[in-house]
């Protein structure tokens, strides 16, 4: 019972932090990781994409928190611990799905309108993954959210991701 209470509290806090972090859509001149012309943010198409992104982000975060409440009632067993751990990390990963969708949609919109891609957009895959062989830094500031992300083109970046995935 105590384990479920602790896991539920951690899940709600972590999903809440993810929500607050991912809610910041405009960072370093890039809207959801895509650099657009200054007047493009006011276009109805762009506003629609942003509103859909925020709506899906809220829905997924609320569903993950509600799903955690349902897991609270599982009987005590080792299976419950496994389910909690998988659900916890799965919930954190699910919150990034709207980011991937919105980034790809904005990139297609940029290409449709013929707006040039900024040089800073090239090494970013989906606005989340950084791959720049010419950049020797192991980690760089994120374009979506807070913190840093690994440069997947460097050995140190790959090792950092591998260690985090194993841990």
Briefly describe each language-model feature range:
Residues 15-21, 48-60, 121-129:
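Alpha-helical transmembrane segments of integral membrane proteins, especially early/N-terminal helices
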Residues 50-63, 155-164:
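Select subsegments of transmembrane alpha-helices in polytopic membrane proteins
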Residues 2-8, 61, 69, 167:
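Hydrophobic alpha-helical transmembrane segments
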Residues 78-116, 164-167:
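Alpha-helical transmembrane segments and their immediate juxtamembrane interface regions
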Residues 20-34, 107-155:
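Membrane-proximal soluble regions of multi-pass membrane proteins
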Residues 64-79, 165-167:
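Juxtamembrane "helix exit" motif at the C-terminal ends of alpha-helical transmembrane segments
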Residues 23-60, 98-116:
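Cytosolic-side membrane-entry/anchor segment at the start of a transmembrane helix
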Residues 1-18, 80-96:
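Alpha-helical transmembrane segments
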């Amino acid at each position: 019972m105590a384990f479920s209470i602790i896991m539920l509290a951690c899940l709600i806090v972590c999903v809440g932090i993810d929500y607050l972090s991912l809610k910041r859509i405009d960072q370093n001149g890039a809207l959801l990781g895509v650099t657009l012309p200054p007047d493009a943010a006011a276009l109805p198409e762009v506003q629609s994409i942003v509103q859909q992104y925020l709506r899906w982000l809220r829905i997924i975060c609320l569903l993950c928190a509600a799903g955690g409440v349902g897991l609270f009632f599982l009987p005590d067993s080792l299976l419950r611990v496994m389910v909690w751990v998988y659900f916890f990390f799965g919930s954190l990963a699910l919150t990034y799905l709207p980011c991937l969708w919105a980034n790809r949609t904005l990139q297609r919109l940029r290409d449709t309108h013929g707006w040039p891609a900024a040089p800073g957009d090239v090494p970013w895959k989906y606005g989340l993954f950084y791959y720049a062989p010419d950049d020797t830094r192991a980690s760089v500031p994120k374009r979506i959210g807070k913190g840093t992300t690994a440069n997947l083109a460097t050995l140190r970046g790959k090792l950092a991701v591998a260690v985090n995935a194993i841990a």
